[in-house]
Structures are given as C-alpha cells and as structure tokens.
Regions:
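Nuclease catalytic cores that cleave nucleic-acid phosphodiester bonds
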Residues: 1-152
Length: 152
C-alpha cells in the first residue's frame, strides 16, 4: 500500500480551497502536494514546479497520480485521466467527478467550446463564496473518509 496523498492542480485553485485542503490533510494525516508552473508564486516542501508549457502541470500531475490518490482540479479532461487511474477527483467548488458522469461533463465542456468558437459568449465563474468553501471541505472530507474505509 502506498502513502495516501492529495494532489492539487494549483495553477487554477483558489487560495482558500488550497488552505482548506492543506488543513484537512494535516487533520487526516495525508500528504498534500501542489503542482503549478513556475509563473505562480508557490513554494513549500511538497510543491512541484513545472515548466510553463501548455498542459505541463496537467501532464505531470496525471503521471504522478496513483490509485487511491485524491486530485483537486478544475480541468475536466485531467479529471477523466485521474479516474482512469483508479484515483478520485474533485473541483475546488466541491463537485466530485465520478466515472458514471464524467462523459457528460466532457461533452458539456466540448459543447461550450464549440459555442465559443462560433462566436458565442459564456459566463465566467462566479465569485467564490463561503458556501463554496464549505462544499469543498465537505466533499474532500467525504473522499478522505471513503479512502480510509470509514464510508462505504
């Protein structure tokens, strides 16, 4: 059995979600790793800095992920790769990706991209709220407890 870990795509992770994840990892005794390009001002013993190339962070994070890990990302394509490795994935807003629904999320992403390529405009993300923080904390806690075998 390998060390249980939470891996965070820190390029687009709100600082509050990052702080929540680090606190919960301390509480549960899990290692927490952050991944970001060198353009981001992050550091620490468990921070991995990668090149600034397109998809560099996602590629490194996907390559480092092992079965049983939990990955925090807003990238639906990366989440699909993570699920294929028998790991869990959730967004900083608390949406847990699951194998049964990932195809829907990928199709929705593709439809929005097609719409934008055709000249359409889509809304950006809403401002982060305390409800988002609570939802993320609850979802991450659920996955941590599930991985520990406390939830079936």
């Amino acid at each position: 059995m390998h060390e249980t870990r939470v891996l965070i795509d820190a390029d687009a992770c709100p600082r509050q979600a990052l702080a929540i994840a680090q606190e919960l990892c301390r509480e549960y005794g899990w290692s927490c790793f952050t991944y970001a390009s060198f353009h981001h001002q992050l550091s620490g013993p468990n921070h991995i800095t990668v090149d600034a190339g397109p998809q560099a962070v996602d590629t490194r994070l996907a390559n480092d992920t092992r079965a049983g890990d939990i990955v925090v990302t807003q990238d639906i394509g990366l989440a699909a790769l993570i699920l294929g490795k028998q790991a869990s994935s959730l967004t900083p807003h608390g949406l847990i990706f699951d194998p049964e629904h990932i195809a829907f999320h990928l199709e929705e992403r593709n439809e929005k991209a097609r719409f934008r390529r055709g000249g359409g405009r889509t809304r950006g993300p809403a401002a982060r709220t305390r409800v988002d923080d609570q939802r993320f904390a609850e979802a991450l806690r659920f996955l941590l407890e599930k991985e520990r075998g406390e939830i079936v």
